[in-house]
Amino acid sequence: DGISMLQTADGALASMTSSLQRIRELSIQAANSTNSASDKKALQEEANQLIQEIERISTTTTFNGDRIFDFTGSSVLGDPDKLAVVYGLQNGWLEQAESQIQEYFGISGDGADMSIELTTFTDGAGGTAARVVGSVPGSYTGKATDVKLQIDMSDFTPPNLPNGGSAPFYNDRIISHEMVHAVMYRSMNIASMFDPAVDQTWFLEGAAEFIHGADERLQSSISSIGIGGVMTKATTFGSAGAGWGGTSDDYSAAYTAVRYLHQAIKDNGGSGIKDVMVYLNQNQSATLSQAINAATGGVYADADAFNADFVANGAAFIAG
């Protein structure tokens, strides 16, 4: 469990920080000219004990049998790249993502555990940089369970902190994208979106791109296949489609569709895509079609009606 590992490391670091602060206090006391030789000896002995305690913590703090602060290849954190990724997760990537999701989408997780894995998945550099996986009910109703965030270290190396990676696929953006999936998995009837009869993967991926913005990706797609090519991707969305393609251009089209829906909701007096998310969260059995209908005040009867409008008018929206 990645979160538990981070908590273990955080507790050990807090203890070492306390010892270092005490050593600093002792050094200041030792500089006082009124100290006798025996006083200075006592201060030095206490400092030595604190140093030994720091060394003990650094060599004995473990998680699942691995030394957390062992900087050798034998430790899960011995790899400096893995250590940097864990540092990025602990010092901003996760917190920033959760904060953005709460602010802009109005949803948060339900407190269920989520594993973070650095070594269980890889498809090589340039493939899937990270993914969230979970068990979706076969009835296509309800939340996902056993949710895991799996990071492909081949795409996170070198980590290039603090943002990580390079434009437009910065590591912190990738984590934000995946955390949208993780939170949606545990905050709504996510299983209904995986039903092959409706296939609403476009919304899952478009919303995940929308949280951090994907204009750079969209511009790259336009340069490659043109606005018409992007819109052709949109014709596969929903029940009329042939399933999610998964290419960068598919993500561009999905992102644009969510942007279009966001604007349509605002034009109807709502606050945007947040209204869809909040509706799904507050109505645990609701489907995306019902949420879109409610958020737009009935402008769209269902998700397919929205898709039809987007296919017809999305090109002008992109160009405009």
Question: Where is each model-derived feature located?
Answer:
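Sec-exported extracytoplasmic/periplasmic mature domains
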Residues: 28-32, 52-55, 59-62, 98-109, ...
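Surface-exposed patches in mature extracellular/periplasmic domains of secreted proteins
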Residues: 66, 100-119, 190-199, 221-225, ...
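Acidic/His/Gly-enriched intrinsically disordered linker/tail segments
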Residues: 192-270, 279-320
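Amphipathic alpha-helical coiled-coil/heptad-repeat segments
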Residues: 3-81, 94, 99, 113-117, ...
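Zinc-dependent metallopeptidase catalytic helix centered on the HExxH motif
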Residues: 137-220, 225
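Active-site rim elements
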Residues: 7-10, 84-86, 240-248
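Zn2+-dependent metallopeptidase catalytic core
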Residues: 80-120, 124, 132, 165-166, ...
